[in-house]
Amino acid sequence: MSALSALVAAVVLAGWAGTQSEAGLRPATVVRAGDGDTLDLASGKRVRLVQVDAPELGEGECYARRSLNALERLAPSGRQVELERDPRLDDLDRYGRLLRYVHVGDRNVNVELVWRGAATPYFFHGVEGRYADELLAAVAEARARQRGMWGACRVSWHRDEPVATRPR
């Protein structure tokens, strides 16, 4: 494991360990992934993975299908997940979707998607949430290693704007 990988792992684990008990995690069951940053739940609710953005399927963006596939692998249909609300951030987006971090076991799916290069951090209106440091460390490593969209696409990204991708 490289020094950068070890640092990212340490930051992620430290953040997770320090927040898990007070996070108020709520169980939910996944029905399907709508795209690379949205899940439909058995309760009928829809979750927008907060603080991340994945390429848009409907806009034909580069890596959109693979981002969806990454989320489907991390949180497949029928999987029990834990949802975490960040009190620093809005509860719902303008479409009425829950804004949540999604956890599967000891994995923060939001951070994992960024680490894999399937999504980028997205700090709406510049507001950084509970896992901002982990998300920024994950994107730095994904970019450096050309993981996911960083190796496959031309990526236009700024931390407080949605990601835009196109083929190389």
Model regions: which residues?
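Small beta-barrel nucleic-acid-binding modules, primarily SNase/OB-fold domains
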Residues: S2-R168
